[in-house]
Amino acid sequence: MKVLWAALLVTFLAGCQAKVEQPVEPETEPELRQQAEWQSGQPWELALGRFWDYLRWVQTLSEQVQEELLSPQVTQELTTLMDETMKELKAYKSELEEQLSPVAEETRARLSKELQAAQARLGADMEDVRSRLVQYRSEVQAMLGQSTEELRARLASHLRKLRKRLLRDADDLQKRLAVYQAGAREGAERGVSAIRERLGPLVEQGRVRAATVGSLASQPLQERAQALGERLRARMEEMGSRTRDRLDEVKEQVAEVRAKLEEQAQQISLQAEAFQARLKSWFEPLVEDMQRQWAGLVEKVQAAVGASTAPVPSDNH
């Protein structure tokens, strides 16, 4: 009887374990498929795949991971992988923007805005992963010597959510980049078509000119030389007439300028004479008054000097 109960208990536990582990497999299947696509895609996808592999390793929460999470090594490596991913993504985006030059400005701006938003979401997802690991390290260090099972469970749950969000945003970014690339290809094809449309009339004109030259080649050389001489003569006469007209205009303009200069010089001369006369009328009375004062002063000085040199009468008489 005990053996029967033991067999039933083992069967029940095995069934429970199968029910618990069963939902995990479909969850990781798209992730593995997405990882395989990244490893065979663009350089930015390869860099994101390396970030993804590192995140899967961290999510195992093995003993080695637990030890390294207590040091900044994990976050430093994640930062390096993040920077590498964003750098490759920006380079790929710049390459696509160069190919989008023939596309309309409005379309290019809209695609660029959507791609920047998707790129920002992917960067924010990776930044959340790093921030969560930094927070976990701080919490573990604060609970040193205590049980961290609850912290590990919370971290595992957060990492699963962040990984799903990262997968979703990376897939969205891939789709938008595909649209971006399709727009670049379409723009390049439109550019080629536009060039072909512009070159078509030129080619036709060249064909017409070639036909005209061929027909002219059949004419006698003397007739063509005579026609060319007449055209040159008419052209020279036209240029000579224009030159003479231009010279006449220049002469008239020079005469007008000379007349204006002479008139201005005469006006300036009259103004100078009037100003000189005005100055003379101002200063002549002043000069005459100064001369009179000076003469009076000289007379007074002479009188004073004469009085001082007169002989003094003697008292002997």
Curated annotation (Swiss-Prot):
Family named by the database record: Belongs to the apolipoprotein A1/A4/E family.
Top-level lineage group: Eukaryota
Annotated keywords: Chylomicron, Endosome, Extracellular matrix, Glycoprotein, HDL, Heparin-binding, Lipid transport, Lipid-binding, Oxidation, Phosphoprotein, Repeat, Secreted, Signal, Transport, VLDL
Pfam short name (any one): Apolipoprotein
Subunit structure: Homotetramer. May interact with ABCA1; functionally associated with ABCA1 in the biogenesis of HDLs. May interact with APP/A4 amyloid-beta peptide; the interaction is extremely stable in vitro but its physiological significance is unclear. May interact with MAPT. May interact with MAP2. In the cerebrospinal fluid, interacts with secreted SORL1. Interacts with PMEL; this allows the loading of PMEL luminal fragment on ILVs to induce fibril nucleation.
Residues carrying Phosphoserine: S147
Chief site of localization: secreted
InterPro entries in UniProt: ApoA_E, Apolipoprotein_A1/A4/E
Protein name, per record: Apolipoprotein E
Record: residues binding heparin: L162, R163, K164, R165, G229, E230, R231, L232, R233, A234, R235, M236
Gene3D superfamilies registered for this protein in UniProt: Apolipoprotein (1.20.120.20)
Post-translational modification: APOE exists as multiple glycosylated and sialylated glycoforms within cells and in plasma. The extent of glycosylation and sialylation are tissue and context specific. Glycated in plasma VLDL.
Positions of Sequence repeats: 80-101, 102-123, 124-145, 146-167, 168-189, 190-211, 212-233, 234-255
Lipid-binding and lipoprotein association: region residues: 210-290
Keyword Transmembrane: no
Stretch list, region LDL and other lipoprotein receptors binding: 158-168
Region 8 X 22 AA approximate tandem repeats, residue ranges: 80-255
Sequence segments annotated as region (Homooligomerization): 266-317
Keyword Ubl conjugation: no
Residues modified to Methionine sulfoxide: M143
GO molecular function, a single term: tau protein binding
Location in the cell: Secreted; Secreted, Extracellular space; Secreted, Extracellular space, Extracellular matrix; Extracellular vesicle
Signal sequence residues: 1-18
Any one Gene Ontology cellular component term annotated for this protein: very-low-density lipoprotein particle
